[in-house]
């Protein structure tokens, strides 16, 4: 790889690292496994850099598949840490995280991984249905149905979390 290609690759990775890490985390639910998945995907991308026509979609596809592979490992299933908290990408200060943001994260982690990946690609990454289907290696209809089911599950979970907060507030007021 010549210097121009190396520079282009470094710029690409620098601009998209947070997004790729988030995709991997949303897919596998563990930051350590997500880091491994991103690293493995970027190694493969680096080796194929000159031949890749659409590096954004290629990188997202590779990261998604690597994250899925990480979740399939038997050691992952046995040693998954309980309650692995999702750190705030924009701010490392946990005090700056709002209650609403925490509620949304909790609700999102309750959505099944496939639906969570679709929601992330469609609504956080802003991919079209076809682009998300390419990344996930499925049909556009699958993306549509998974997005609809994922949004319904997310709404249901957010409603449940909201109602439990209202009950806690009511109980606090009665004391």
How would you name each of these model-derived features?
Residues 69, 77-101, 128, 167-174:
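Internal acidic/polar
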Residues 8, 152-175:
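C-terminal edge and immediately downstream basic/flexible tail or linker adjoining helix-turn-helix-like DNA-binding
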Residues 11, 103-112:
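Short amphipathic alpha-helical boundary/capping segments
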Residues 17, 21, 42, 112, ...:
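C-terminal flanking helix
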Residues 118-122:
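A short pre-motif secondary-structure segment
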Residues 47, 54, 61-83, 96-97, ...:
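Arg/Lys-rich amphipathic alpha helix in sigma70-family domain 2
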Residues 54, 68, 136-160:
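DNA-recognition helix of helix-turn-helix
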Residues 1-11, 21-40, 48-53, 140:
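Short, charged helix-capping/linker segments at alpha-helix termini
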